[in-house]
């Protein structure tokens, strides 16, 4: 009886294999995920459009690849000037959860945060003319005092806490507050350097030499150890297949989910939309004012 059961199981496996082959079900795939645009937490902008790279997008695409047993390796097509520090860090955390080989393919530009999210991939491929690097941080805080005066707006400010109003943009920073801002920026810079050092197996001292904020071409980046190979997407796909020990894999290009108009409205929030509608009479200056008041805190970015 046991012998018969074993034979039945073998026959069933052979039949399933034949069915999967005849139906064209791939057993070995390389998934290609396109990541294009600035790095930020939300979806594409309502008024200015354009794609963005968000943690939510990266998470959903990587989860799909992780759950597909036929996907043996992943290629990330990165085209980004960088963006929000926190979003870059969250995306890198998502990438580090993947146990399958990951190869990054750089396009025209993969700078600052675009490089940050790629630094811990198994391999990085860049075109000779790719612009990459730009390892550094920029923190911006607008001073709205002149704009308020132009618009005829006077503000009464009440605070509790020595530096509570330093982020309001209503006055110049004191020397002490400028030191606070610089220390925060330096700390984020150190975090960037640590990620690159770990991901590229370089000493922190070496990375600091490279981390001047300048851009490098793909050729320069390879010479400096910031990328592994020169080539395009096909080079990255072949390299990913090689890392996964797969010959002639099927390449599956993941389509980017386009957020609906409704989801974009929900992401922005009803109150913010209402503010935008009300501020249109103020023109460009009003929009700048709205954006600053809606989030008056510093905007440190890897860009």
Predicted feature locations:
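Extracytoplasmic ligand-binding site segments that recognize negatively charged/polar headgroups
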Residues: 134
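N-terminal organellar transit peptides
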Residues: 2-104, 109-113, 123-127, 138-303
């Amino acid at each position: 009886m046991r012998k018969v059961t074993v034979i039945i199981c073998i026959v069933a496996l052979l039949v399933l294999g034949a069915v999967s082959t005849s139906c064209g079900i791939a057993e070995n795939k390389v998934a290609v995920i396109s990541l294009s645009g600035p790095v930020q937490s939300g979806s594409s902008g309502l008024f200015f459009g354009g794609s963005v790279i968000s943690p939510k997008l990266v998470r959903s695409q990587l989860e799909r690849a992780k759950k597909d047993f036929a996907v043996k390796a992943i290629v990330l097509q990165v085209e980004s000037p960088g963006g929000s520090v926190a979003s870059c860090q969250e995306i890198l955390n998502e990438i580090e959860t993947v146990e399958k080989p990951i190869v990054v393919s750089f396009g025209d530009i993969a700078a600052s945060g675009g490089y940050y999210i790629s630094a811990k991939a198994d391999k990085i491929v860049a075109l000779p003319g790719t612009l990459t690097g730009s390892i550094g941080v920029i923190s911006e805080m607008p001073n709205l005092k002149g704009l308020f005066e132009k618009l005829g707006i006077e503000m009464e400010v009440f605070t509790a806490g020595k530096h509570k109003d330093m982020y309001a943009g209503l006055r110049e920073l004191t020397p002490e507050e400028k030191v606070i801002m610089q220390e925060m920026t330096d700390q984020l810079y150190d975090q960037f350097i640590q990620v690159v050092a770990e991901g590229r197996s370089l000493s922190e001292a070496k990375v600091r030499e490279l981390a001047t904020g300048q851009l490098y071409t793909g050729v320069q980046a390879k010479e400096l150890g910031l990328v592994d190979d020169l080539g395009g997407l096909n080079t990255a796909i072949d390299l990913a297949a090689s890392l996964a020990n797969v010959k002639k894999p099927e390449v599956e290009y993941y389509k980017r989910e386009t957020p609906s108009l409704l989801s974009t409205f929900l992401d922005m929030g009803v109150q913010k939309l209402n503010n935008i509608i009300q501020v249109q009479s103020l023109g460009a200056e009003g929009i700048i004012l709205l954006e600053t008041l809606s989030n008056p805190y510093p905007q440190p970015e890897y860009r």
